[in-house]
Swiss-Prot record:
Source organism of the structure: Caenorhabditis elegans
UniProt-listed InterPro entries: HMG_box_dom, HMG_box_dom_sf, SRY-related_HMG-box_TF-like
Stated name of the protein: Transcription factor sem-2
Region called Disordered, residue ranges: 158-218, 321-359
Gene (UniProt): sem-2
Biological process terms in GO annotation: brain development; mesodermal cell fate specification; myoblast fate specification; negative regulation of transcription by RNA polymerase II; neuron differentiation; positive regulation of egg-laying behavior; positive regulation of embryonic development; positive regulation of mesodermal cell fate specification
Length: 404
């Protein structure tokens, strides 16, 4: 073979003569090949060992790709984004990839190439089970790659701190609930430094309010007792306004049992006249006298007090009303109707007593007719006794006492 001429395969390939290498190109190529044969053998042996170590998974080439990228751009501003080929987002910073994520990234792509119809959840299950089945020696290269990516992530995001995002809760209708603000209660509990003592006192727990409520309840109970005791010492003038009501006939023993006798009308008519005479006792000489203050202080109505309750030392004498009332015809009608059991009761109910202004006994002398005298005899019967006793109230009642 003539070395001065170029080989025929170069001319056959259409290469121009001026682009052909010089004549001694073959010797130079042989010399370079002989000098670099040792280094080439060492490099090839290392690459073969690495390929044999990562032969069980297809991600070994990807890990090598990360290393080549790091060697190509050692002083990059975004080393993590360049190593992972991901876009940098200003809204959310992703966490650095761990060993499982480094391994599963290429493994997932491999599964998707062979089974494109497999669901993503099923792929994740298979990846998890296969990762757990690997030994620590098989996981070691991926753990080292994850540590290198973590350092790159720290250089790119020095102020990063992992904060897990909570999934928003869903309402029963399927809508998302608005997340609550956790800082609002803390601001209410802790007032600012420049706040006044009054503002801080308002934001304390409600223990003071509970104690005030208990004190207020105790105060109410004491107040009721004081009011009750104060009512016992009220003056007589405050208790004087008394409005008697007509009691039912069944409250007294002499009330009729049946309404056939017609005594109900007579009874209430007599009560009306008694109140009318008591209010005008100063203008009428024969009107009945009022009761003393003793019965009123005890809280007894005029109808409930007896005729003899005022007899005693220091009290005004009580007198029976002996003047003929304006219901004489009604009384006579009730007496003649056959209800003899109610005659004495109706006559005794006509009698009332009250002290006059001068405290002097005033007797009515209205017995001008025979009918009035008969009524007087019925109202004031004769009392018979066997002992000679001086009764100071005999003149006051106007009763004739016979001593046998």
């Amino acid at each position: 073979m003539d070395l001065q001429k170029p080989p025929n395969f170069m001319l056959d390939c259409g290469m121009a003569p001026h682009m052909m290498p010089p004549i001694n190109w073959a010797a130079a190529a042989i010399a370079v090949a002989s000098s670099t044969s040792g280094a080439t053998n060492a490099t090839s042996s290392n690459s073969v060992a690495t390929s044999q170590q990562l032969q069980h998974h297809p991600y070994g080439t990807a890990a090598g790709g990360y290393k080549h990228a790091q060697q190509a751009i050692p002083k990059s501003v975004t080393p993590y984004s360049d190593a992972t080929n991901c876009k940098k987002s200003s809204n959310h910073i992703k966490r650095p990839m761990n060993a499982f994520m480094v391994w599963s990234q290429m493994e997932r792509r491999k599964i998707c190439e062979h089974q494109p119809d497999m669901h993503n959840a099923e792929i994740s299950k298979q990846l998890g089970s296969r990762w757990r089945s690997l030994t620590d020696e098989e996981k070691a290269p991926f753990v080292a790659e994850a540590e290198r990516l973590r350092v790159c992530h720290m250089q790119e995001y020095p102020d990063y701190k992992y904060k897990p995002r909570k999934k928003p809760k869903k309402n029963p209708d399927g809508t998302l609930q608005q997340p609550a603000q956790p800082q609002a209660p803390q601001q209410q509990q802790a007032p600012p430094r420049g706040a006044s003592p009054q503002a801080r006192q308002r934001k304390r727990p409600n223990t003071d309010q509970q104690s005030e409520t208990q004190q207020f309840q105790n105060f109410k109970s004491v107040k009721v007792e004081q009011d009750w005791m104060g009512n016992a010492h009220m003056s007589h003038a405050q208790k004087m306004p008394f409005h008697p009501s007509y009691p039912s006939p069944s409250e007294f023993g002499h009330a009729p049992l049946t309404p056939e006798s017609g005594f109900y009308d007579d009874y209430f008519t007599q009560q009306h006249h008694q109140q009318h005479f008591a209010s005008q006792h100063h203008n009428s000489a024969g009107s009945p006298l009022r009761m003393t203050n003793l019965g009123m202080d005890m809280g007894m109505p005029p109808q409930m007090m007896g005729h003899n309750s005022g007899f005693g030392a220091g009290n005004h004498p009580f007198y029976l009303h002996t003047s003929p009332p304006s219901v004489d015809q009604d009384d006579m009608r009730s007496l003649s109707s056959g209800s003899s059991g109610y005659a004495d009761c109706s006559a005794s109910e006509q009698s009332t007593s009250s002290p006059n202004s001068a405290g002097v006994v005033t007797m009515a002398t209205a017995a001008t007719t025979t009918t009035h005298l008969d009524d007087l005899e019925q109202i004031c019967p004769t009392v018979t006794t066997g002992e000679l006793v001086n009764y100071p109230w005999s003149d006051a009642l106007g009763i004739d006492i016979n001593f046998s």
